[in-house]
Amino acid sequence: GPPLLDLRAPFERALRGGRAEWYRNRYVGSSHISAMRTQPDIAGPNWNNSGLGPNTNVGGFAGTTWAMMEAGGCPVELTYELETIARNDFHGTLPGAFTAHPKVDPSTGELHAMVYAWAEWMDHVQYVIVGTDGRVRHTLDIPLPGMTMLHDMSLTERYAVVYDQPCTVDLELAFAGRFPFRWNPEYGNRVGLLPREVTGRAATAADIIWIDVPLGYSFHPMN
């Protein structure tokens, strides 16, 4: 199936002295996996009733191992052995979607994310900051003219960077049961610089500096 709608199994291996000592992989629990196994659904909140489990990335933060995905799914907490524990919306503080590729600020230890949920949010994305305690401490909705496939973000000392790129949701494809994104050059391409600090107040979407750039798509920027 398409990558965003597929089942994936995270894996890990232990290396010592140039040799692999063990290897394991597991399916991440989800409503879909539970139904196929004729088991009860996994525990935890499912804000958009998605049947999919996180299928894109695994990372550790705030003492927890998380399986993550973009486009709306709730993160799933895993054990060290990659067994599914439950969905975990950062202990009840995440209002909706998350991402597969958050960024840790090395100076504060906080986790930053640009997130989208194409089926639920068609006119905005959301900036999320997770504190070092593993709880969301700040969110900001960022209006967009359409729903771009927001796969990643960048984080600098002064800015959180949002990529508003010409790969956008096509509802005809979605209703036909196909991969819901397509190349859309008429949409344009721009990069938004959201100030992380504004004197005397929190930054808003109106503070974003938008810069038009040539047509293209960046899955994973690097700075």
PLM features per residue range, with description:
Residues 1-223:
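Beta-propeller domains
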